[in-house]
């Protein structure tokens, strides 16, 4: 739910509703490129979840393997930044269906039937301890079936609230990852691999990113490559983007 334009929360009495999420965005992008994409998650048995499923189908994403269970839809509230006013996000993910999901809730033989690539992000294991355990089960089950695993580390400090540090979880999950996607802050906070850059400054020292990628690959020999995104922030709504690939 987003405040209209660049307004503050409830500056006007409305919020714009859209469906999204780290893994869902990837599935939709792949479908838009003409690739076969399936989405696996746990959603509640209500009309809001049905709207979400219809949205995924609209973009060509296969939703047949989505599990329906108790709980609610997770929500996040977004206040879009402008100039020197930063964006603001408020998460409301507790007791969502995926937050309540636990190991054993998904039939992995069915979920991974016909699958050759599994993508996950660091957001899912951050939602709850049971979702973290389910995420670890997922990557282990994928590797048992020789499925390529990719992971966008996607560190979100405001989600890690259940007593475990992101690095405690993500360093274990990374052992099962073939392709990693991250920025320098993700690497520092999720893998505890440090680099000599100031991630808060918004400025890029491009010479250091090859060394950073190599350091990750040396630490995780199971990884075949890592893509590192580079963002140079001029203001809240003006950013320069680039990426590099280490293999």
Positions of PLM-derived features:
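Alpha-helix C-terminal capping segments
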Residues: 25-36
């Amino acid at each position: 739910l987003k405040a209209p334009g660049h307004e503050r929360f409830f500056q006007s009495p409305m919020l714009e509703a859209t469906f999204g999420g780290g893994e869902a965005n990837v599935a939709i992008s792949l479908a838009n490129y003409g690739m076969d994409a399936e989405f696996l998650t746990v959603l509640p048995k209500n009309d809001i979840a049905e709207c979400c499923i219809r949205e995924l189908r609209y973009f060509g994403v296969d939703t047949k393997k989505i599990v329906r269970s108790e709980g609610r839809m997770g929500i996040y509230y977004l206040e879009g930044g402008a100039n020197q006013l930063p964006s603001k996000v408020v998460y409301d993910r507790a007791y969502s269906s995926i937050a309540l999901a636990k190991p054993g809730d998904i039939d992995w033989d069915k979920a991974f039937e016909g699958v050759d690539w599994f993508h996950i992000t660091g957001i899912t294991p951050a939602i709850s301890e049971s979702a973290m355990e389910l995420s670890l089960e997922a990557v282990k089950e994928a590797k048992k079936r020789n499925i390529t695993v990719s992971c966008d580390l996607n560190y979100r400090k405001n989600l890690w609230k259940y007593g475990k540090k992101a690095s405690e979880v993500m360093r274990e999950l990374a052992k099962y990852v073939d392709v990693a996607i991250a920025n320098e802050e993700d690497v520092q906070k999720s893998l505890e691999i440090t680099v000599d850059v100031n991630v808060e400054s918004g400025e890029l020292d491009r010479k250091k990113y090859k060394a950073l990628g190599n350091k990750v690959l040396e630490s995780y020999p199971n990884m075949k490559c890592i893509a590192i995104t580079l963002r140079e922030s001029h203001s809240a709504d003006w950013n320069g983007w680039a990426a590099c690939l280490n293999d």
